[in-house]
A protein has these predicted regions:
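Membrane-water interface segments at the C-terminal ends of transmembrane alpha-helices
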Residues: 1-67, 95, 99-116, 120-122, ...
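Glycine-rich helix-loop "coupling/hinge" segments at transmembrane-helix boundaries
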Residues: 115-143, 176-179
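Short helix-to-coil transition segments within interhelical loops
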Residues: 69-97
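Residues in the helix-turn-helix
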Residues: 25, 86-87, 128
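Hydrophobic alpha-helical segments of integral membrane proteins
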Residues: 7-14, 84, 92, 129, ...
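Short functional hotspots where side chains directly engage DNA or cofactors
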Residues: 87, 132, 149
Length: 179
């Protein structure tokens, strides 16, 4: 138990490390490693660099509901003869749908806001709404800037709205799971 708890603590520290180190210095180090390995400017690597910052926030959002989940629900299903995978899909995942959707929404919001990883790791080859907003902000036309900023704001708002409404449609016949 002691080794497992120590390993868990080490993994959590590694996951939360990108939040503890200033982003510009952390990403400069990551970029240096990727340039040395010839991996900069690739789409998959850019997605992984966004995940460096998305995963800690999603873990923060999911840790409370996951730890609060009462295992007796899945244990009861297995006692009644259901396989673990079936009890996971039929019981645990539906009960954790709302936290999972909100974790996705938070992760999406964090990813939309990532400017430094997109520029440094993407080697300036990928255009996102955030990189466009930052480049347009240096220009004189505030109308275009406001339109882009509104789009940047609306994307997470749409995902949060979907996270709120999806359980109402998925569980229309289960009142307590619609909350």
């Amino acid at each position: 138990i002691g080794k497992s708890r120590h390993l868990n603590s080490a993994i959590q520290t590694f996951i939360y490390l990108p939040l503890l180190i200033p982003q510009i210095s952390f990403m400069a180090g990551v970029q240096l490693l990727l340039v040395a390995g010839g991996l900069d400017g690739r789409w998959g690597i850019l997605v992984l660099s966004h995940l460096l910052f998305v995963l800690p926030y999603t873990f923060i959002v999911l840790s409370g509901p996951y730890r609060a989940f009462d295992r007796r629900f899945t244990d009861q299903a297995m006692i009644l003869g259901r396989h673990y995978l079936k009890s996971l899909v039929r019981i645990k995942l539906p009960m954790l749908t709302r936290p999972l959707l909100f974790a996705f929404a938070v992760g999406f919001s964090v990813s939309v806001a990532q400017y430094i990883p997109t520029i440094l790791i993407g080697a300036g080859r990928f255009s996102t709404i955030t990189t466009e907003v930052v480049s347009i902000s240096a220009g004189p036309d505030r109308r275009i800037l406001s339109a882009y900023a509104l789009i940047q704001q609306m994307l997470p708002l749409i995902v949060y709205g979907a996270a709120i409404l999806t359980p109402k449609f998925l569980f229309y016949n289960r009142r307590q799971m619609q909350l």
